[in-house]
């Protein structure tokens, strides 16, 4: 059937004699100290009482003249409360992200096909699911800011999430 013959055989690798391994089999590390108390409760981690009331205020704009900047000046530092043993070191106390009364724009956040259940109104932003961090709109509402949400773009060819149909 095959006039060329068989394929050449590959040489086998020589057997290595067992010897001392390059790395030690066990590595002795110091044991971590045991926990002395339970971790803090969820409500203790997210208390806004660690920020001084004056630290989270927004500087007011003075009467601007033509050509002046329309942006608010950045605060140089935020004064925080004394760090004690009650605050876990993994969490840093900070002020609100959105100043109260400000308006936050969330582009493409409104989905025309989304339904929020019975009794939902147009001004209702649902809370985040358990175990999930809040999105920008939910954070702004929690901190007293206004939220403006624009509709997600969709067309006949790109589709949408409103349960439409496809013609093949």
From Swiss-Prot:
Regions of biased composition (Low complexity) lie at: 1-13
Chain span(s) of sequence motif PPAY: 39-42
Q: Which GO terms describe its biological process?
A: positive regulation of RNA polymerase II regulatory region sequence-specific DNA binding; protein destabilization; stress granule assembly
The record lists its disulfide bonds as: none
Q: In which tissues is it expressed?
A: Widely expressed. Expressed in spleen, thymus, prostate, testis, ovary, small intestine, colon and leukocytes. Down-regulated in multiple myeloma.
GO cellular component terms, semicolon-separated: cytoplasm; cytoplasmic stress granule; nuclear body; nuclear speck; nucleus; protein-containing complex
Complex and partners: Interacts with SOX6. Interacts with DAZ1 and DAZL. Interacts with IL17RB. May interact with FAM168B. Interacts with INCA1. Interacts with EIF4G1 and EIF4G2. Interacts (via PPAY motif) with NEDD4 (via WW domains). Interacts with transcription factor TCF7L2/TCF4; the interaction results in localization of DAZAP2 to the nucleus. Interacts with transcription factors TCF7 and TCF7L1. Interacts with transcription factor LEF1.
This protein's name: DAZ-associated protein 2
Q: Which organism is it from?
A: Homo sapiens (Human)
């Amino acid at each position: 059937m095959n006039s060329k013959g068989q394929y050449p055989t590959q040489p086998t690798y020589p057997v290595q004699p067992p010897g001392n391994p390059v790395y030690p089999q066990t590595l002795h590390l110091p044991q971590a100290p045991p926990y002395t108390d339970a971790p803090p409760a969820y409500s203790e981690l997210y208390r806004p009482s660690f920020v001084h009331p004056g630290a989270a205020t927004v500087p007011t704009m003075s009467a601007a003249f033509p050509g002046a900047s329309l942006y608010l000046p950045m605060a140089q530092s935020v004064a925080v409360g004394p760090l004690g043993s009650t605050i876990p070191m993994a969490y840093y106390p900070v002020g609100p992200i959105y100043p109260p009364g400000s308006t936050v724009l969330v582009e493409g956040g409104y989905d025309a096909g989304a339904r929020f259940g019975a009794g939902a109104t147009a001004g209702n932003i649902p809370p985040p699911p358990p175990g999930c961090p809040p999105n920008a709109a939910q954070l702004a509402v929690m901190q007293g800011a206004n939220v403006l949400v624009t509709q997600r773009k969709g067309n006949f060819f790109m589709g949408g999430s409103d349960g439409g149909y496809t013609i093949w």
